Amino acid sequence: MRIAGVDLPSQKKLEVALTYLYGIGKTLAKEILEACQLSPDLRVRDVNDEQSMRLRQYIEQKYLIESDLKRVESMNIKRLMDIGCYRGRRHRALLPVRGQRTRSNARTRRGAKKTVAGKKLAK
């Protein structure tokens, strides 16, 4: 089954397979299946065409997923950078945005360590 350009793995249960879509986690997958009146234990390969269409239409109408969601997220970050707010400046400087410390740690955001030579002691 294919939703929003993503092939869902046929051997997985529907609840797990939906999490392969960017923007859909376990909780949202459960809600979607409940709204579409599908069993979470149903395997993707066992879903018939009618159920598949119902699921696809529900997801596309109700939620932003995959490239649409990524585009909205990147536009939100770009907007923050354009208006020059604190969060935008942190994004632009590639520093942690949510108040994490940077004196130590923050290696994920800042990249590999760049060693700076210490001061020489006078003798």
From Swiss-Prot:
<keyword id="KW-0689">Ribosomal protein</keyword>
<comment type="subunit">
    <text>Part of the 30S ribosomal subunit.</text>
</comment>
<dbReference type="InterPro" id="IPR001892">
    <property type="entry name" value="Ribosomal_uS13"/>
</dbReference>
<keyword id="KW-0934">Plastid</keyword>
<keyword id="KW-0694">RNA-binding</keyword>
<dbReference type="GO" id="GO:0009507">
    <property type="term" value="C:chloroplast"/>
</dbReference>
<feature type="region of interest" description="Disordered">
    <location>
        <begin position="99"/>
        <end position="123"/>
    </location>
</feature>
<feature type="compositionally biased region" description="Basic residues">
    <location>
        <begin position="100"/>
        <end position="123"/>
    </location>
</feature>
<dbReference type="Pfam" id="PF00416">
    <property type="entry name" value="Ribosomal_S13"/>
</dbReference>
<protein>
    <recommendedName>
        <fullName>Small ribosomal subunit protein uS13c</fullName>
    </recommendedName>
</protein>
<dbReference type="InterPro" id="IPR027437">
    <property type="entry name" value="Rbsml_uS13_C"/>
</dbReference>
<dbReference type="GO" id="GO:0015935">
    <property type="term" value="C:small ribosomal subunit"/>
</dbReference>
<dbReference type="InterPro" id="IPR018269">
    <property type="entry name" value="Ribosomal_uS13_CS"/>
</dbReference>
<dbReference type="GO" id="GO:0006412">
    <property type="term" value="P:translation"/>
</dbReference>
<keyword id="KW-0687">Ribonucleoprotein</keyword>
<keyword id="KW-0150">Chloroplast</keyword>
<dbReference type="GO" id="GO:0019843">
    <property type="term" value="F:rRNA binding"/>
</dbReference>
<keyword id="KW-0699">rRNA-binding</keyword>
<dbReference type="GO" id="GO:0005829">
    <property type="term" value="C:cytosol"/>
</dbReference>
<comment type="function">
    <text>Located at the top of the head of the 30S subunit, it contacts several helices of the 16S rRNA.</text>
</comment>
<dbReference type="GO" id="GO:0003735">
    <property type="term" value="F:structural constituent of ribosome"/>
</dbReference>
<dbReference type="InterPro" id="IPR019980">
    <property type="entry name" value="Ribosomal_uS13_bac-type"/>
</dbReference>
<comment type="similarity">
    <text>Belongs to the universal ribosomal protein uS13 family.</text>
</comment>
<dbReference type="InterPro" id="IPR010979">
    <property type="entry name" value="Ribosomal_uS13-like_H2TH"/>
</dbReference>
